[in-house]
Swiss-Prot record:
<feature type="disulfide bond">
    <location>
        <begin position="26"/>
        <end position="32"/>
    </location>
</feature>
<keyword id="KW-0130">Cell adhesion</keyword>
<feature type="modified residue" description="Phosphoserine">
    <location>
        <position position="186"/>
    </location>
</feature>
<keyword id="KW-0732">Signal</keyword>
<dbReference type="GO" id="GO:0007596">
    <property type="term" value="P:blood coagulation"/>
</dbReference>
<dbReference type="InterPro" id="IPR000372">
    <property type="entry name" value="LRRNT"/>
</dbReference>
<feature type="transmembrane region" description="Helical">
    <location>
        <begin position="151"/>
        <end position="171"/>
    </location>
</feature>
<dbReference type="Pfam" id="PF01462">
    <property type="entry name" value="LRRNT"/>
</dbReference>
<feature type="modified residue" description="Phosphoserine; by PKA">
    <location>
        <position position="191"/>
    </location>
</feature>
<feature type="signal peptide">
    <location>
        <begin position="1"/>
        <end position="26"/>
    </location>
</feature>
<dbReference type="GO" id="GO:1990779">
    <property type="term" value="C:glycoprotein Ib-IX-V complex"/>
</dbReference>
<feature type="domain" description="LRRNT">
    <location>
        <begin position="27"/>
        <end position="55"/>
    </location>
</feature>
<dbReference type="InterPro" id="IPR000483">
    <property type="entry name" value="Cys-rich_flank_reg_C"/>
</dbReference>
<protein>
    <recommendedName>
        <fullName>Platelet glycoprotein Ib beta chain</fullName>
    </recommendedName>
</protein>
<feature type="topological domain" description="Cytoplasmic">
    <location>
        <begin position="172"/>
        <end position="206"/>
    </location>
</feature>
<keyword id="KW-1133">Transmembrane helix</keyword>
<feature type="modified residue" description="Phosphothreonine">
    <location>
        <position position="193"/>
    </location>
</feature>
Length: 206
């Protein structure tokens, strides 16, 4: 008798427990805890940085790596992201950092990013990244590299726009289908109840 309440309580706690992130959702070589992704102190570079992170990531740790820049659009694909730890990286302040600087400029909590300093080029060494002007970043790149970086950023934004449009189209299609099913169900119920109502009315008149 006493074991049943304990068993019911255990089942209730299991049902109320927050779902854990599946192992496949955590990119190697990072470690994940709930919506926090820790990729710090992994020796990551531009080439070895994971191509994507779980979309529900709220905190991303990239400190103490060998990152000189981030792939364009990487942080923009994380709508729930609230904080990114970017310190202790050898940031090269050129046109490839324009997407990161734009992302930082739109963050309300700028105090977390005031320690990001440029390591290269020599003209910008020691400068705080959030306070480096866009023109200075563009000037640090060759024209060809600047055009290539802009093209990559535009392609990333285009892909994101297409994905959003596709999701919106699927949602609208689903809503139309549900509305049509509800309308058909209502028509079917009316066709079934109408003869009964007519029969009841006829019986009362006789």
């Amino acid at each position: 008798m006493g074991s049943r309440p304990r068993g019911a309580l255990s089942l209730l706690l299991l049902l109320l427990a927050p779902p854990s992130r599946p192992a496949s959702g955590c990119p190697a070589p990072c470690r994940c805890s709930e919506t926090r992704v820790d990729c710090g102190r992994r020796g990551l570079t531009w080439a070895s940085l994971p191509a994507a992170f779980p979309p529900d990531t709220t905190e991303l740790v990239l400190t103490d790596n060998n990152l000189t820049a981030l792939p364009p659009g990487l942080l923009d694909t994380l709508p729930a992201l609230r904080r990114v730890h970017l310190g202790a990286n050898p940031w090269r302040c050129d046109c490839r950092l324009l997407p990161l600087r734009a992302w930082l400029a739109g963050r309300p909590e700028r105090e977390f990013y005031r320690d990001l300093r440029c390591v290269a080029p020599l003209a910008l060494r020691g400068r705080l990244l959030p306070y480096v002007a866009e023109d200075e970043l563009r000037a640090a790149c060759a024209p060809g590299l600047l055009c290539w970086g802009a093209l990559v950023a535009q392609l990333a934004l285009l892909v994101l726009g297409l994905l959003h449009a596709l999701l919106l189209a699927l949602l609208l299609s689903r809503l139309r289908r549900l509305r049509a099913q509800a309308r058909a169900r209502s028509t079917r119920e009316f066709s079934l109840t109408a003869p009964l109502v007519a029969e009841s009315a006829g019986g009362g008149a006789s």
